[in-house]
């Protein structure tokens, strides 16, 4: 049995220490280097470790933004336990419930759950999505007949970068139908891809 892994993954050496901090309910000072912006120290109450797309993420309460955030382990440059600060426990349900409305790990709290409808023009893509849905809410609305009579599917999620990335894999064989703001954002990304590659 083989599992997908990334042997060159940076930051996994922090996994054990972060897991122990979660179990021990310890407050951490994390040295974090975001993809955009300067490296900084963040006071963090760790709750959960999650893997997505061969990458590990630490979920917890970020004191700076007063909200739950996730930090990619490969961007954590170091951490230490902070004494004298009371640990703030997670007050929600289980983490399966927390992530149920998203593809991946990014939850944009200001973005509501939406029904994304799309057409599938290719039989291989249609069959692939039926047997390997990218989210548990993916539903078939109309079966595939031909490229002229495509399938219609829908997924009920909070739109985020990971959803767009998954749909871009199939961009040559699908058409986003609704909602229009998501459709326009998706089209803008496709136009940018074309501009970069012409």
Which residues are covered by each model-predicted region?
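Short aromatic-glycine-enriched beta-strand elements
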Residues: 55-59
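Polybasic (Lys/Arg-rich)
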Residues: 100-198
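Bulky hydrophobic/aromatic content
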Residues: 1-33
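Short, surface-exposed charged micro-motifs
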Residues: 46-48
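Well-ordered beta-strand positions
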Residues: 50-51, 168
């Amino acid at each position: 049995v083989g599992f997908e892994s990334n042997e060159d993954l940076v930051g996994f050496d922090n996994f054990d220490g972060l897991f122990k901090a979660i179990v021990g309910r310890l407050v951490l000072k994390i040295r974090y280097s975001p993809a955009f912006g300067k490296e900084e120290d963040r006071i963090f109450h760790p709750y959960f470790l999650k893997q997505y797309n061969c990458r590990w993420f630490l979920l917890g309460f970020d004191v700076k933004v007063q909200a739950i955030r996730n930090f990619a382990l490969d961007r954590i440059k170091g951490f230490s336990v902070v004494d004298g600060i009371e640990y703030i426990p997670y007050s929600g349900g289980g983490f399966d419930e927390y992530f149920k409305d998203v593809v991946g790990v990014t939850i944009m709290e200001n973005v509501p759950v939406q029904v994304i409808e799309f057409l599938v023009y290719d039989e291989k893509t249609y069959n692939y999505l039926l047997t390997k849905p990218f989210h548990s809410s993916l539903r078939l609305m109309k079966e595939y007949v031909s490229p002229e009579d495509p399938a219609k599917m829908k997924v009920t999620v909070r739109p985020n970068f990971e959803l767009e990335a998954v749909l871009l894999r199939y961009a040559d064989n699908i058409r986003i139908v609704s909602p229009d703001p998501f459709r326009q954002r998706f089209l803008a990304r496709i136009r940018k891809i074309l501009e970069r590659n012409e």
